[in-house]
């Protein structure tokens, strides 16, 4: 229930990093008091053919257990300005993220939560980096997104489409 009383102010002086002591947090951010910048795969890093891969909806799509249905290659989204975009994940004073979208020339910032048990990531006050022309593919670019792969050099996040094109 509700508790009524006079407001109280407090200041948080430090960041308890015990809950981010996991390899996945380190892969994503570079570790406590560090930050790491991520870029789109343009096909030259050896992990994907381009900025987007479609998962096979007839199979299981989860952490380290998914298969590509279609990997259309570089430029499939039709947004050639996307290649200078970045996502910076930081554990400096909190779990912070900064998204620079080179197509729109906009930077958004917020926080994120990495659920290492369920392999999901949630953004607050910003969205997962995506090409602006694809914003209508889903209403959810930020909550409980499926982390499919993550190591020190590459990351795949699954977004479930909720438009007329179907879920994957």
Describe each PLM feature range.
Residues 1-108, 115-168:
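Lipid interaction determinants
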């Amino acid at each position: 229930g509700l508790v009524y009383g006079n407001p109280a102010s407090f200041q948080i002086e430090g960041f308890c990093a015990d809950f981010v002591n996991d390899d996945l947090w380190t892969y994503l951010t570079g570790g406590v008091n560090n930050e790491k910048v991520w870029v789109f795969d343009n096909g030259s890093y050896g992990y994907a053919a381009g900025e987007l891969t479609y998962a096979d909806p007839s199979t299981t799509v989860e952490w380290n257990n998914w298969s590509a249905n279609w990997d259309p290659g570089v430029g499939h989204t039709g947004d050639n300005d996307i290649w200078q975009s970045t996502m910076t994940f930081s554990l400096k004073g909190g779990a912070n993220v900064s998204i620079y979208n080179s197509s729109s020339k906009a930077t958004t910032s917020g926080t994120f939560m990495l659920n290492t048990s369920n392999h999901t990531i949630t953004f607050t006050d910003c969205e997962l980096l995506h090409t602006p022309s694809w914003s209508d593919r889903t209403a959810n670019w930020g909550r409980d997104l499926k982390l499919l792969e993550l190591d020190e050099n590459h990351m795949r996040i699954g977004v479930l489409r909720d438009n007329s094109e179907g879920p994957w």
